[in-house]
Swiss-Prot record:
Keywords: ATP-binding, Ligase, Nucleotide-binding, Protein biosynthesis. PROSITE patterns: AMIDASES. NCBIfam families: gatA (TIGR00132). The keyword Protein biosynthesis applies. Belongs to the amidase family. GatA subfamily. GO terms for cellular component: glutamyl-tRNA(Gln) amidotransferase complex. The active site is at K79 (charge relay system), S154 (charge relay system), S178 (acyl-ester intermediate). It catalyses: L-glutamyl-tRNA(Gln) + L-glutamine + ATP + H2O = L-glutaminyl-tRNA(Gln) + L-glutamate + ADP + phosphate + H(+). Heterotrimer of A, B and C subunits. GO terms for molecular function: ATP binding; glutaminyl-tRNA synthase (glutamine-hydrolyzing) activity. This is Glutamyl-tRNA(Gln) amidotransferase subunit A.
Length: 485
């Protein structure tokens, strides 16, 4: 049996029944990483010794018949912008090359408390800015379904690790679609929770009012398992909500009778690949056949979401990335004349093109002459988009759409076409702007590549997402597909 192909809940059952040891599972994944990651590029750092040490500790507990925790013995990969004590945290940027984290992010602490085995740090677009993981300063991540195609981004390494069987579970971050879009491209399940459901403490900030940590897994149950483990109030992050975290496993029922689902016409317009549309429409029919009430709806302000997002996120990035100055840690230019020159050259040489593009855009829209015309107006548009979603959720329990307008595109295909790259997030960005939760799960294959179905719900209604996603998943077999790599 190939342990790397199994889900987290399958591995949990085997561990509980003493059919396998945690060390055996961990070594199987480390062997898999050593075998395939030179081609897939999911990992930027592998913590082999520490992972085996933790696995042995869990095996001792199992032998003593101690109660297992939620993630005991389950291999997890962590995106390289989420701090793990003693491991590198580079954000896939030259400017942080060699930086080792002195502390754990809140979500990392929670995984350790639940005895998950952290295998290492995962590849990403630099500072989480990108939709293909081609902006990593260190290596290219490739889609396990087709090595000539991108895995999506910015959490490309997180999706590749799960789809390529290099981790059972992974954590990514989602600012405008960076968990959902790579989940769609790689055929795994990825959740962007409600803003404030999961702590951002210890996560390197890109857009502080948009960033969210999101779990990825091979199926909906795995995703629910990891969400339950890491969600909840954190006093170090004042944006986290003081709301009880439900046991999301209880949401995993096949009963969706009477659930009201809206189909927004704006998500099915020009630019949507006809075969992706067909797969999503077939998925909607399955939900309807299973008892959901499906009706059309409209989100007329969606067309403004992408523009508002890039203004707001770039403005926040300009502020957040000002701390990387070449003085305190990270990359420092070797050729400089004075202190001002250190800042200028260290940042110019340390940041990649996409990061510099967004810093410049953000600085521009925050400047005295343009603040009202761009940034302030974008905030007003954001409020209207939130109101739009709230209006729809008074009538519907959830909204269903494609996750991305296409399947995974070829490496290099959009690298120099900035607008085309940005448009790959056109269906995920509005959800981030509104701050509501959404899940992506596989709903078909087009020319050997996965298609993602996006289900969106109201604030803190992740249980509705898991319920609908699980119902659909159990009616089809797409979650059982494994990339033959």
């Amino acid at each position: 049996m190939d342990l790397t192909k199994l889900t987290a809940h399958e591995l949990k059952d085997m561990l509980s029944n003493k059919e396998v040891k945690a060390e055996e599972i961990t070594k199987a994944f480390l062997d898999r990483i050593n075998l395939v990651d030179n081609k897939l590029g999911a990992y930027l750092y592998v913590s082999e010794e520490e992972a085996i040490k933790k696995a042995k500790e869990i095996d001792v507990k199992i032998e003593k018949n101690e109660e297992l925790k939620a993630l005991s013995g389950i291999p997890v990969g962590i995106k390289d912008n989420i701090n793990v004590k003693g491991m590198q945290n580079t954000c896939a940027s030259k400017i942080l090359e060699g930086y080792t984290s002195p502390y754990d992010a809140h979500v990392t602490e929670k995984i350790k408390q639940e005895e998950g085995i952290i295998l290492g740090k995962l590849n990403m677009d630099e500072f989480a800015m990108g939709s293909s993981t081609e902006n990593s300063a260190f290596k290219l991540a490739k889609n396990p379904w087709d090595l000539e195609r991108v895995p999506g981004g910015s959490s490309g390494g997180s999706a590749v690790a799960v789809a390529g069987s290099e981790a059972t579970l992974s954590l990514g971050t989602d600012t405008g679609g960076s968990v959902r879009q790579p989940a769609s491209f790689c055929g795994v399940v990825g959740l962007k929770p409600t803003y404030g459901r999961i702590s951002r403490s210890g996560v390197v900030a890109f857009g502080s009012t948009l960033d969210q940590v999101g779990p990825m897994g091979k199926d909906v149950e795995d995703c629910a398992l990891l969400t339950s483990a890491i969600a909840g109030l954190d006093k170090k992050d004042f944006t986290t909500a003081d709301k009880e975290v439900p046991d999301y496993k209880k949401s995993l029922t096949k009963d969706i009778k009477g659930k009201r689902i809206g189909i927004p016409k704006e998500f099915f317009g020009d630019g949507l690949d006809k075969n992706v549309r067909k797969s999503v429409e077939e998925a909607i029919k399955v939900l309807e056949a299973n008892g959901a009430e499906v009706k059309p709806c409209s989100l007329p302000l969606m067309d403004y979401a992408l523009s508002a997002y890039y203004i707001i996120s770039s403005a926040e990035a300009s502020s957040n990335l000002a701390r990387f100055d070449g003085i305190r840690y990270g990359y420092r230019s070797k050729n400089f004349k004075d202190a001002k020159d250190i800042y200028l050259k260290s940042r110019s040489e340390g940041f990649g093109d996409e990061v510099k593009r967004r810093i410049m855009l953000g600085t521009y829209v925050l400047s005295a002459g343009y603040y009202d015309a761009y940034y302030k107006k974008a905030l007003k548009v954001r409020k209207l988009i939130k109101d739009d979603f709230q209006r729809v959720f008074k009538e519907f329990d959830a909204i269903v759409s494609p996750t991305s307008p296409t399947t995974a595109f070829k490496v290099g295909e959009k690298k120099d076409d900035v607008m085309s790259m940005y448009l790959s997030d056109i269906y995920t960005v509005p959800i981030s702007v509104a701050g509501v939760p959404a899940i992506s799960l596989p709903c078909g294959m087009v020319d050997g590549l996965p298609v993602g179905l996006q289900i969106i719900s109201d604030y803190f209604k992740e249980d509705v997402l898991f319920n609908l996603a699980y119902n659909y998943e159990q009616s089809v077999d797409f979650h059982k597909m494994r990339a033959d790599f």
